[in-house]
């Protein structure tokens, strides 16, 4: 999911102290997919890794809307094409 224009308070609540711009949210099963997604996303676009949890598969990325969306699409493409993950649609608010 992409949060295109989060309120400032949300960054603090998520522990994203120096973050700005959009937030991209992943929850990936199996959880090691989050580590792969973080690597792919960071190489796909000018984003920052806000949080990655290798135990529950959570990944938060931040950056401008276009970069976050591009990174998310590249992650989905990579996981589905090369690793057999089921595709999903990226939602946005």
What role is predicted for each listed range?
Residues 7-14, 44-48:
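N-proximal short alpha-helices
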Residues 1-11, 87-93:
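C-terminal low-complexity, charged extensions that often adopt amphipathic alpha-helices
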Residues 2, 25-33, 63, 67:
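Catalytic cores of large soluble enzymes that bind and process phosphate-bearing ligands
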Residues 43-48, 54-93:
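C-terminal binding/interaction regions
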